[in-house]
């Protein structure tokens, strides 16, 4: 066996071990045939009918070049348009991709929580994480491509093209997943949800990116910004320039790290996500209200409150309750609150697992007065750190084969995922239903004034778009 072959098998074994450990006893077998290369495509790839020409390349413009800001409404309209054209098979692909992204998200959320430590909060977008990894898959060659596919949780057979993920199909399905989130059936009474994704490809001068690779990321997001800057002379200054650029282009107030990076890096692949939802029938309470970070410490924060008919249930055995708040026709905010705040770590480990959706029940709605902090959550993490924590630091390290990304193999530095999640009062709207009818049960008061978990779930695809933990509404994570 060649050294390269031995290294590939060893790395894949390491990845499989990590996947199996995080999955517990679960056997992760699903039909992925809709996401694989077809036999006809494999035949074309293995026996091209025409001579393959060199792929066109380009050098990104300098980061200080004038750039038009992102139009979030246009991004949303493109997602809506793509979703309106979905056929039955497209929806099946979207459901498969959502399932894989959910599973990947739980694994990485566990790593993120462990890295953050106790009582520091966390937020993660499984689709954004998944899209980032699939983007690298599209830009990679073996052995890196096979390793990334295994990391995504999809089996690969050595030498079998038809067991390979078709990255273009996968990102198109991910586009459908995002579109189903923001498309709410055109209901005029429902405030539209907003989700925007921006990708920054920040390169060292001299690295030329391959045009087909950059274009292939279009379904993930049309808002792609390749920009060049000096990454080696002053890494801290480079990080500041990137942050200023992102702020200027998006207008989003995000938690962007200012740490310097490795001076020999030639590519940063950064993904930025903004989600904004209006809570129909909720209004902001006057003044500030106490949120208990722990038994002895409170902070004063703005609170939202609304009364309506919501689904709510308690798990008496595990001592937590769940309140289900609609954000759209198929989108739900799940608020998970332990009966005792000190149990949050235990509940987090118990609930945020691969079988999370089995915890979601469907009880009859009941009259509830719900009060919770106004959420404006900012979070960032470097995927490289999570891979290193999982002992997979070489996956996107110096030896990674990313030959489809640029004219020379890029050396990947930062792989940032940054999230801005906003849940606001929908004061201009009426409550979902009247709070209480004659003869109905008394209104239940549910107040989230201590640490809790949350998730945003879209029913049609089965996607969990966000997983998070709020320890202190004033903190970024």
UniProtKB/Swiss-Prot annotation:
Keywords: Disulfide bond, Glycoprotein, Secreted, Signal, Vasoactive, Vasoconstrictor. Residues 1-24 form the signal peptide. GO terms for biological process: adenylate cyclase-activating G protein-coupled receptor signaling pathway; aldosterone secretion; angiotensin-activated signaling pathway; angiotensin-mediated drinking behavior; angiotensin-mediated vasoconstriction involved in regulation of systemic arterial blood pressure; angiotensin-mediated vasodilation involved in regulation of systemic arterial blood pressure; artery smooth muscle contraction; associative learning. GO terms for cellular component: extracellular region; extracellular space. SMART domains: SERPIN. It is found in: Secreted. In response to low blood pressure, the enzyme renin/REN cleaves angiotensinogen to produce angiotensin-1. Angiotensin-1 is a substrate of ACE (angiotensin converting enzyme) that removes a dipeptide to yield the physiologically active peptide angiotensin-2. Angiotensin-1 and angiotensin-2 can be further processed to generate angiotensin-3, angiotensin-4. Angiotensin 1-9 is cleaved from angiotensin-1 by ACE2 and can be further processed by ACE to produce angiotensin 1-7, angiotensin 1-5 and angiotensin 1-4. It holds the Pfam family Serpin. One of its GO terms (molecular function) is hormone activity. Glycans are attached at residues 295, 319. Disulfide bonds join 42-161. Its main location: secreted. The keyword Disulfide bond applies. InterPro entries: Angiotensinogen (IPR000227), Angiotensinogen_serpin_dom (IPR033834), Serpin_dom (IPR023796), Serpin_fam (IPR000215), Serpin_sf (IPR036186), Serpin_sf_1 (IPR042178), Serpin_sf_2 (IPR042185). Belongs to the serpin family. Essential component of the renin-angiotensin system (RAS), a potent regulator of blood pressure, body fluid and electrolyte homeostasis. This is Angiotensinogen. It comes from Rattus norvegicus (Rat).
